Amino acid sequence: MNSNINKTVTLINKGMFPYKEAWDYQAFLFNQILEIKSDNRNIAIEEQKETPNYLITCEHPPVYTLGKSGDEKNLLLDNAQLQNVGATYFHINRGGDITFHGPGQLVVYPIIDLENFFTDIHQYMRLLEEAVILTCKDFGIEAGRIKGLTGVWIGERDSARKICAMGVKTS
């Protein structure tokens, strides 16, 4: 077992960040982690390097993203309409369906080696939800979960509105 477990998470605030640049930056950081993990396989435990953990925060110009399990029919705008409203569209390899990101909306991308913490993806998702719920509380917003659904919601179940969508890719 690697004794170089790193529980530090580096916060990177990118401000307004075009979606494609954010996607490429995430891939760059992710590949750095993979390279360290690959190199660590070939050296003695005491010489292994820690893998870093990052939390990227940003806003995006108007963009719609569609996850692997999504349905393109849920994007209600065609290419001309997207262009007319100044939005872009990307089909990406995270979970989830269609999501809109725009100015004023905080977007958070954790690039984390879960082996530094735990590897239970369901526990990870619930902890992310809990972080959002507690952050909402700090702003006087009562938020919570809806059984069987991923994300964070405000309001009662029959009239709930999603305040936080979540889609992750694990590898």
Question: Predicted regions span which residues?
Answer:
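Catalytic cores of processing enzymes, dominated by hydrolases/peptidases
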Residues: 161-171
